[in-house]
Design a protein with these regions (language model features):
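Vicinal oxygen chelate
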Residues: 1-3, 9-18, 57-81, 83-130, 135, 169-171, ...
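N-terminal beta-strand motif that seeds the catalytic metal site of vicinal oxygen chelate
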Residues: 1-21, 62-67, 118-142, 155-158, ...
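Conserved short beta-strand elements that form part of the metal-binding/catalytic scaffold
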Residues: 31-64, 68-69, 110-118, 159-191, ...
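Short hydrophobic alpha-helical module
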Residues: 151-154, 173-177, 196, 203-216
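Core segments of cupin and vicinal oxygen chelate
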Residues: 2-50, 96, 100, 136-178
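Conserved active-site tyrosine of GNAT-family acetyltransferases
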Residues: 23-28, 82, 109, 144, ...
Length: 277
């Protein structure tokens, strides 16, 4: 991986909707977070360790996700490494990062933003669940893996194979098992984003919160093979999947990737699984 990328953590992402305010208020209620209007018609949902930008656009779209670097020196060194490789650098689309942030486009056209927060991340709120990873589905999974691993410098943690063909790839930008992953699918689209809680008891408490809001669990509870984390998922009003996770595996930077078979047990050691392809 590039020397300058490690560590980087998911700071925020943008979720688009034809009804941006309605979706922002759903997430505010879901997470118990404050909701505020931003310039340009965007909305901010901010809480303890998590920030979400909601904008007007196509249903379920995630036009970018944003990784926070350690400091300005790391950000500058990383940009220089990318430029030396001939990577096209674009202006940052994020209203939450300070000047100096920049973006690159992945093979599916989604922007990955790198930068530093313009202000402190949310610290208010009683509910514990920090924004931790984003996952997409893609029709060109091999190209996506090559881009994120070889061009951007994320470290491959696990891959899933079906008859020798790549079915999923999990990559990390810090010791947590994955900050980004991609699945092979018939169409390229967002898959889910995930909030990491502290323990199994937190998963229970978030499940109880879903019950109080009359939001049914869509998948889980269960335990993933890659990452070994406890989880459940719900759907937001547009069908985008939202995961609550605990005990995600920590993987040293130098650890080589593992290979898993494409089967239900890989995605859920406890039972049935959501098979993307």
């Amino acid at each position: 991986m590039t020397a300058a990328l490690w560590p980087a953590t998911l700071h925020h992402l943008r979720r688009d909707s034809p009804e941006a305010e309605r979706l922002a208020r759903f997430y505010g209620e879901l997470l118990g977070d404050r909701v505020e209007a931003l310039p340009g018609g965007e909305w901010l949902v901010a809480g303890r360790g998590r920030m979400l930008v909601v904008g007007k656009g196509a249903k379920c779209a995630v036009p970018y996700f944003a990784l926070e670097m350690r400091d300005a020196a790391q950000l500058g060194a990383y940009r220089r490494e990318l430029e030396q490789r001939g990577t096209a650098i674009e202006p940052s689309p994020s209203p939450l990062f300070a000047p100096g942030a920049f973006a690159v486009a992945d093979p599916d056209g989604r922007r990955v933003v790198f930068g530093l927060p313009a202000s402190a991340s949310g610290t208010e709120g009683k509910t514990v669940a920090r924004l931790q990873h984003f996952v997409c589905a893609s029709t060109q999974l091999e190209n996506m893996l090559a881009f994120y691993r070889d061009r951007l410098g994320l470290v491959e943690s696990d891959r899933v194979l079906e008859d020798g063909a790549l079915a999923a790839a999990f990559l990390r930008s810090d010791p947590e098992h994955h900050s980004f992953a991609a699945f092979r699918a018939p169409e390229s689209r967002p898959d889910h984003h995930s909030y990491e809680t502290g323990s199994w008891n937190d998963i229970r408490d978030w499940g109880d919160r879903m019950a109080s809001l009359r939001i049914p669990l869509w998948w889980g509870p269960g335990r993933h093979g890659p990452g070994n984390n406890l989880f459940f998922m719900i759907e937001d009003p547009e069908g985008h999947k939202v995961e609550f996770s605990a005990e995600l595996e920590l993987v040293p930077r130098e650890t080589a990737f593992r290979t898993w078979p494409h089967e239900q047990r890989t995605l859920n050691l406890w039972g049935s699984a959501w098979m993307r392809s």
